[in-house]
């Protein structure tokens, strides 16, 4: 299946540049593009990627891997590929920081299906760094609080039946949109959290005084 290049509306007027593919041989080129965009002309507190996973119908394996930097998203349908992409394995283990919402089950599935684990210090579970009322705040609640109120129904508006179709090729447009938004939200949540932390670094360094205002 040839790669698809699409525009996906994330929220408001924010549009994502999305590449969707199940061809392993095409992934290295897109990864290099993402890495260049990650590495060059980027503030230190923005050097990371958003990561998200979608699972097979039996929930036992990874069907789709999504990576996001800024408004650039790669959707790789692992379940319909030849499952041989050493460049992806190297990329995930290269020391780049990845932000994801709730990786507890994903870590096991990545280990069993890929035979690889992202280094512990390079994988940030956003549910452990940002909390609202509950210990593990949902992606939708975080997105409403930090990005846009439009994300309030980002999970409930996606038909449950579509969750069983992540192995279908090509993916339905609604699945592509859902996958792209998930990856973008993972990236954008962590970006906003890091911007705030970066802006408050002086409070930890020297404390706060009226002269700062």
Predicted regions span which residues?
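N-terminal accessory regions of nucleic-acid-interacting proteins
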Residues: 1-49, 81, 126, 184, ...
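Short acidic, Gly/Ser-rich segments with clustered Asp/Glu that frequently serve as metal-coordination loops
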Residues: 48-60
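A short alpha/beta connector and helix-capping loop motif
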Residues: 57-73
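Nucleic-acid-processing active sites and adjacent nucleic-acid-binding tracks
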Residues: 72-92, 96
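Acidic beta-strand-to-loop metal/phosphate-binding motif
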Residues: 97-103
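A short alpha->loop->secondary-structure connector
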Residues: 113-123
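Short alpha-helix plus adjacent loop in nuclease-associated cores
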Residues: 124-148
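Acidic, Mg2+-coordinating catalytic module of metal-dependent nucleases/exonucleases
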Residues: 144-211
């Amino acid at each position: 299946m040839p790669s698809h290049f699409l525009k996906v509306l994330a929220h408001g007027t924010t549009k994502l540049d999305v590449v969707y593919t199940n061809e392993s041989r095409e992934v290295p080129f897109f990864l290099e593009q993402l890495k260049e965009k990650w590495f060059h002309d980027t503030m230190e507190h923005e050097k990371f990627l958003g990561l998200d996973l979608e699972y097979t119908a039996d929930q036992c394996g990874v069907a789709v891997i999504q990576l996001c930097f800024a408004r650039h998203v790669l959707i790789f349908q692992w379940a319909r590929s030849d499952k041989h992409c050493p460049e992806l394995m190297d990329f995930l283990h290269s020391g780049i920081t990845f932000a994801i919402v709730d990786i507890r089950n994903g870590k096991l599935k990545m280990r069993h299906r890929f035979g690889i684990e992202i280094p512990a210090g390079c994988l940030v579970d956003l549910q452990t760094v940002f909390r609202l009322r509950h210990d593990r705040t949902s992606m939708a609640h975080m997105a409403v609080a930090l990005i846009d109120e439009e994300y309030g129904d980002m999970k409930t508006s996606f038909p449950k039946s579509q969750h069983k179709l992540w192995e279908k090729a090509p993916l339905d447009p609604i699945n592509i949109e859902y996958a792209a938004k998930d990856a973008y939200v993972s990236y954008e949540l962590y970006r906003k959290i890091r911007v705030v932390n970066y802006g408050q670094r002086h409070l930890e360094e020297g404390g706060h005084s009226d002269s700062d205002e």
